[in-house]
Amino acid sequence: MFKKHTISLLIIFLLTSAVLAKPIEAHTVSPVNPNAQQTTKAVMNWLAHLPNRTENRVLSGAFGGYSHDTFSMAETDRIRSATGQSPAIYGCDYARGWLETANIEDSIDVSCNSDLMSYWKNGGIPQISLHLANPAFQSGHFKTPITNDQYKKILDSSTAEGKRLNAMLSKIADGLQELENQGVPVLFRPLHEMNGEWFWWGLTSYNQKDNERISLYKQLYKKIYHYMTDTRGLDHLLWVYSPDANRDFKTDFYPGASYVDIVGLDAYFQDAYSINGYDQLTALNKPFAFTEVGPQTANGSLDYSLFINAIKQKYPKTIYFLAWNDEWSPAVNKGASALYHDSWTLNKGEIWNGDSLTPIVE
C-alpha cells in the first residue's frame, strides 16, 4: 500500500513538473487589417502586451498641433525643457475643420509628415487625428450641427456633400500614403468624441441618445475604414476609437471589433481618480489608452503626477496617454517631471532596443 501510494505521488509530481516546465506560448495580438505591414503588426502586438509589465508600460504622448496652422515640434521641446524627456507619441491633426476655403479639401494639410517621419526614425510613434470640415457646407463648419438627413447625404458619394467628403478623404489618404512609403506606422484616430454634441459627426444634443445618428456614425466610420484600407491599400494604420469621458453612450458608437485596434477616452478632468468610462471601454477587450488628456479648467493647476498615480491605481490597463498642448500641457501645469520620470512611463527612445522593440512580457 505504501509503495503504491509513493508511486502515485511520484507520477503526480512528474506530471506537475512537466506542466510547469512547459514554456508559456506567445499570444499575438494582430491589427484588424489582416494585410498590415510587418512593422505595424509588431507595434500592435508590443502595445497590447504593455500591461503585462511591472514598469515601463505606459507611453507618454503629446499633441503637436494642427498641420500648417499650429503644428511644430515646440510642444516636445517644451516638455523636454520641463522634464528632460520627450514624449513617446507625438500627435498631428491633418484637418483644420474651421477653415473657410474655396474647396473643402484645402482644409486638409499633411505638411507635418516630415516631422512625423523624423519622430519615428528617432524612436517615437506618430498619432494623427482629424478635426474634419463639415461636408454639408462648402468649407469650415466643423462644429455646426447637421440633421440626420444631411448626414445621409454625406454618406452618399453621388451627392455634393458626399463628393466633398470623398475629396477630403482622398487628400488625407495621400498624406498617409507618404508615411506608409517610409515604413512609418500611425495611430489613426478619426471621428473622435462622437458622443459629444460639438462636432458635426456626433450627437446634436447634450446626452440625448439618437439611435439613427449612432447608426449613421458607424456607417461613416466604416466608410472611412474601407476607403483607407481597401480602396487605398493603406496597411500601416492602427485604428483608434475615442469617445469623450464626460458624456454618456461611450460604447454605443463602437463600430465593431473588426474596425478598431485600440479604444480610449478623451478625458479633460480636475480629479484624475474620477474619470468615467474606463470599465466600459476595457470591456470591449481592446488595448486601452487615454487618447486625449488635460485639465478641465486650464489654469495651470492640474497635477499630472496624480494622473499617473491614478493610472496605476484605477486604470492599470492603460498603454498610453496623449496630453493636449498649449494651456493643457503638462509643461505648464504641475507634476510634469514626476509624470515623465515615473517607473511606469515610457518615453521617446525607450521603445526600441537597437533595431527591435523592447522585449514583450507574456
Briefly describe each language-model feature range.
Residues 9-18:
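Bacterial N-terminal signal peptides
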Residues 22-107, 308-309, 351-362:
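N-terminal module-boundary/linker segments of secreted carbohydrate-active enzymes
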Residues 43, 70-79, 110-114, 172-174, ...:
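Alpha-helical scaffolding within the catalytic cores
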Residues 54, 58-64, 291-362:
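Substrate-binding cleft of secreted/luminal carbohydrate-active enzymes
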Residues 54-58, 85-88, 122-127, 181-187, ...:
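Loop/turn elements at helix/coil->beta-strand transitions in domains of secreted/extracellular proteins
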Residues 62-63, 189-191, 221-249, 288-298, ...:
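Aromatic-lined carbohydrate-recognition surfaces of secreted/lumenal glycan-active proteins
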Residues 99-230, 234:
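Substrate-binding cleft of extracellular glycoside hydrolase catalytic domains
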Residues 248-300, 338-339, 343-356:
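Glycoside hydrolase catalytic-domain groove-lining segments
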